[in-house]
């Protein structure tokens, strides 16, 4: 399911890093939306809401801080009692296999994205004005 191979060249600057992260973001959002549809089909509204929130959070993330927050949110459902690992669809078989496959793909791609954020080229610092307006200072000249 995941379009991103482990044999990719490492980004050499922030622009390349951003393009890679945007690709991860689109794929994660797509996988999460696919999960939402599966869970909705099986009336699992609580888990559906969690994956819907993740799809929205990762899709709207504009900074590494926001990306990491979304990744930590989705990774938090994978441990402890009553976690995603303890859950299964009552309609076993193909639906449960799809749930497991999507869940694993989301977890692994989010982990890969987090590693890339931590180890790859760093995001440039933004001024308070840029943070407040969401714009680059260059867009005004």
Predicted regions, residues:
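Amphipathic alpha-helical binding modules
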Residues: 74-141
């Amino acid at each position: 399911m995941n379009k991103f191979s482990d044999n990719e060249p490492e980004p050499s600057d922030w622009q390349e890093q951003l393009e890679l992260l945007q690709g991860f973001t689109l794929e994660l959002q797509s996988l999460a939306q696919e999960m939402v549809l599966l869970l909705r089909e099986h009336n699992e509204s609580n888990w559906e809401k969690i994956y819907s929130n993740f799809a929205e959070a990762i899709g709207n993330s504009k900074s590494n801080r926001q990306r990491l927050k979304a990744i930590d949110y989705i990774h938090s459902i994978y441990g402890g009692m009553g976690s995603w690992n303890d859950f299964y669809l009552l309609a076993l078989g193909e639906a449960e296999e799809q749930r497991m496959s999507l869940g694993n793909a989301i977890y692994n791609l989010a982990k890969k994205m987090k590693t890339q954020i931590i180890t790859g080229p760093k995001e440039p610092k933004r001024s308070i004005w840029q943070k407040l307006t969401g714009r680059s200072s260059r867009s005004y000249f």
